[in-house]
UniProtKB/Swiss-Prot annotation:
Organism: Gibberella zeae (strain ATCC MYA-4620 / CBS 123657 / FGSC 9075 / NRRL 31084 / PH-1)
Protein's GO biological process: autophagy of mitochondrion; endocytic recycling; piecemeal microautophagy of the nucleus; protein transport; reticulophagy
GO molecular function: phosphatidylinositol binding
Pfam families: PX
GO cellular component terms attached to this protein's record: early endosome; endosome membrane; phagophore assembly site
Name the record gives this protein: Sorting nexin-4
Lineage, uppermost ranks: Eukaryota, Fungi, Dikarya, Ascomycota, Pezizomycotina
Length: 460
């Protein structure tokens, strides 16, 4: 990738100050040191996000355990360890176990409570492991634990979501099930009368799918384009990394097969048994370290690329929601203008009009014996009320659209900052894994050479 392409993938290049609203955006300086822990000192977080405040919130997800084993209600729980200085926490360090459905509930609550935030998504549940029945295997649970770790890390780096009361309860409460029951009942009771609203929203979405914005905001068009480019690049990198992981797995199998074949030489060549045995053991050790590298590449780094793509989609969904707010404002404005024009026409005494609709209305009024002047005054009165109501609605829609624009600008800046910190952390971990692998392999073969030299000196 050229330097120009890399620059295009950076959302920080989007100019926020040249357009319609006078938005105040947060300054997001570059993160300095490539620390590997997303919350650790050295990530540049302290200077990178002054809006986060002084409170600390660090979460780790590990140690997946299968519970209710042997029953149809078996599930996997994950250990969450939290270090926090928030006053809402009872202790500075807490540990709880949560299952995946608990994370799903938390995610749904956050998306409901913070509609103007790009809430980080959870790993997809529609995976082949559910079909094959091996969703309790260590490979799957490790991948999921890594993804859930990234989910909580993103929340802890978000200036608004990290302060969400439901998140703090999730991270500390010993009676989380009671919280889910109470919140779930409130949400269901509140949504009962609005069941028809689901169809209304669907109808709105369907209609608006064929409606274009009259004045699209160039700022958000640029963000959408850069987000699409990011998804494209991540998709290409993911394919290459997946191929690397497969080749590392194949190489591990070949190394173990090679070690086994050398072991078969020992009965045939007993006079070189120490050398062959040591060589075979060194190959086995190399294969074991290669397995660790492959697991890190496959289970952690490859998963981080997919999770970042999902996070980018969440941002684009927020852009669609912002576009909907602007569309509502434009359509209401158009309706207001139409009603105002119709009212002014009636007030000017040209209520009859020259259209086919006006002609038919006049004929119907004649048949019914309606006084045309009285009917015109009645229509004028209704239009006055409609214009007044629409004026308030348009002003409300404008304020909502402007406020949503402001929030989306902040969300894009937060996404860019979190993305940068996470990518540096993941690349740092991948680099550390390679350094450890090559260091261990070099040590293995250096020891083998030393042993062979000792045996050569002794035999001499």
């Amino acid at each position: 990738m050229t330097a120009t392409e890399q620059q295009q993938d950076d959302f920080s290049n989007v100019s926020w100050s040249e357009h319609v609203h006078d938005q105040q955006t947060r300054s997001v300086p570059d993160a300095e040191e490539p620390g590997h822990d997303m919350n650790a000192p050295g990530t540049g977080l302290e200077r990178d996000a002054p809006s986060l405040g002084n409170e600390k919130l660090e979460c780790t997800v590990d140690t997946p355990i299968k519970e209710n084993d042997g029953t149809k209600d078996a599930f996997v729980s994950y250990l969450i360890t939290t270090h926090s200085t928030f006053s809402s926490f009872q202790r500075s360090t807490t540990t709880v176990r949560r299952r995946f459905t608990d994370f799903v509930f938390l995610y749904k609550q956050l998306t409901r409570d913070y509609p103007a935030a790009a809430v980080p998504p959870l790993p997809d549940k529609q995976r082949m492991e559910y079909v094959r029945g091996d969703r309790f295997g260590s490979d799957f649970t490790t991948r999921r634990a890594n993804s859930l770790q990234r989910f909580l890390s993103r929340l802890s780096l978000h200036p608004t979501l990290r302060r969400a009361p439901i998140l703090h309860t999730f991270l500390e409460s010993p009676d989380w099930n009671a919280t889910m029951r109470s919140r779930g009942s409130r949400v269901s009771s509140a949504s009962d009368p609005g069941s028809a609203g689901v169809f209304d929203n669907f109808a709105d979405t369907f209609i608006n799918a064929f409606t274009k914005l009259h004045r699209p905001d160039r700022r958000f068009l640029e963000v959408k384009e850069k987000s699409d480019k990011l998804d494209d690049d991540l998709g290409h990198i993911e394919k290459v990394i997946a191929r690397v992981a497969r080749r590392e797995a194949d190489l591990e199998v070949d190394l173990r097969d090679l070690a086994e074949q050398f072991q078969k030489l020992i009965p045939l060549e007993p006079h070189v048994e120490p050398a062959v045995h040591g060589f075979s053991a060194s190959i086995e050790d190399t294969a074991s370290h290669l397995r660790k590298l492959k697991d890190m590449t496959d289970q952690d780094y490859l998963g981080s690329l997919r999770d970042m793509q999902a996070y980018s989609i969440a941002l684009k969904n927020l852009l669609k929601a912002r576009e909907q707010k602007q569309l509502d404002y434009e359509q209401l404005t158009e309706y207001l203008n139409k009603s105002t024009t119709e009212r002014d026409t009636l007030q000017s005494g040209h209520g009859g009009g020259s259209g086919a609709g006006s002609f038919l209305r006049a004929k119907i009024e004649d048949v019914r014996g309606v006084d045309h002047e009285q009917a015109r005054r009645e229509r004028t009165r209704k239009l006055e009320l409609r214009v007044e109501e629409l004026t308030h609605e348009v002003e409300s829609a404008r304020k909502t659209s402007d406020m949503f624009d402001d929030e989306v600008v902040k969300e894009v800046a937060d996404f860019e900052r979190i993305k940068r910190i996470e990518m540096k952390a993941q690349l740092g971990s991948l680099a550390d894994s390679h350094i450890e692998f090559y260091g261990e392999v070099a040590s293995i073969w250096e020891k083998y050479v030393e042993e062979m030299e000792k045996q050569g000196i002794t035999s001499a």
